[in-house]
Amino acid sequence: VKRLGPADAGEVLTLQRAAYVTEARAHGDLDLPPLLETLDETRAALASVLSWGIREAGRLVASVRLTVTGEVGVIGRLVVAPDRQGAGLGGGLLRFAESAAPAEVTVFRLFTGANSVGPLHLYAKHGYRETHRTPENNHELVHLEKARVHPPGRVR
């Protein structure tokens, strides 16, 4: 797992678009924000958040973003290349982002579409619980939250 930055924006955007097509189809909405994001927006986002990726043979196959505001870490754009989904990369990257978050983060939040069966299962498996839902175009977003668990003996 390596840090990503603005120089990785082209690869991140390509990966993101490939990964979100499935979600767009599941929700009948091709206007999902990750599919509409421009290269400049991706570059700006990577300059302002913490982001990590996994490469295999030089190819970016998974990435995630973490936005920290006070005690809250918001996980976003957790994506895995379609041909590598189901291999544990998403869960591994999620755990990595949680462990790499600054010490002041006490809670993690994220959201996904209500029809995103795979991601909802992944997040539940990793301890995330639904807090509420909000309307988004012709579907709902499911908002989830998880309290940070500090390893025993770790100073907070």
Report residues per predicted region:
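A short helix-loop-beta-strand connector motif used in the catalytic cores of GNAT acetyltransferases and
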Residues: L39-G53, V74
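A short beta-loop-alpha structural element at the N-terminal edge
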Residues: V1-T14
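Conserved GNAT-fold acetyl-CoA-binding loop/helix
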Residues: T14-T42
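Conserved GNAT acetyl-CoA-binding A-motif
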Residues: A100-T112
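Conserved active-site alpha-helix within GNAT-family acetyltransferase domains
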Residues: G91-R95, A114-H132, N137-E140
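Conserved beta-strand in the GNAT
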Residues: G53, R59-V68, V74-V79
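A short, internal acetyl-CoA/4′-phosphopantetheine-binding micro-motif in the GNAT/acyltransferase core
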Residues: G53, L78-Q85, T112-A114
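Glycine-rich acyl-CoA binding loop
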Residues: I75-G76, G86-L94
